[in-house]
């Protein structure tokens, strides 16, 4: 058997895209998911429309409203997001029997011995990306020999 291969799937807009799935009429509106920690409210997930208006993840809510006055917000729902990620994890099981959640918005798949079933690593990654897009999910992929390298490629390459 060849070397270990790990695919990292990172969903940078997972919480916002989950909210858009729940409220279908918001798809073209700028939407931010807001995390509250004490009196501090920060944006933890953004729709594509919000990012296009110049809003960035990690920014304070008041600053974001100054940049984008029509910004819609929804409170962060960690339990709902975890359940949604678990559903995505079950879907990803079609590519590998070993799928693990990585943080609140990522998955790691051990592709060792599995990729040939999909026509190779590139074809498997392409299929995963296309199926995510068809479901309205933005995904960034990283493929490497170690989980750490795959994680970094998905987020920074």
Q: Across the structure, where does each feature detected by a protein language model lie?
A:
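Short, low-order "capping/linker" segments at domain edges
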Residues: 151-157
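Residues that scaffold, gate, or flank divalent-cation-dependent active/transport sites
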Residues: 1-108, 113-115, 122-130, 134, ...
């Amino acid at each position: 058997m060849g070397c270990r291969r790990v695919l990292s799937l990172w969903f940078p807009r997972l919480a916002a895209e989950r909210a858009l799935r729940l409220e279908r009429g918001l798809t073209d509106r700028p939407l931010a998911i807001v995390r509250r920690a004490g009196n501090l409210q920060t944006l933890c997930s953004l729709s594509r429309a919000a990012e296009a208006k110049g809003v960035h993840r990690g920014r304070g809510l008041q600053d974001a409203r100054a940049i984008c006055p029509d910004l819609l917000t929804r409170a962060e729902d960690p339990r709902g997001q975890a359940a949604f990620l678990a559903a995505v994890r079950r879907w990803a099981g079609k590519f590998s029997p070993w799928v693990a959640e990585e943080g609140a918005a990522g998955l790691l798949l051990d592709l060792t011995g599995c990729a040939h079933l999909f026509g190779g690593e590139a074809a498997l990654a392409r299929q995963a990306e296309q199926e995510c897009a068809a479901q309205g999910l933005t995904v960034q992929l990283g493929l490497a020999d170690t989980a750490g390298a795959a994680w970094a490629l998905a987020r920074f390459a």
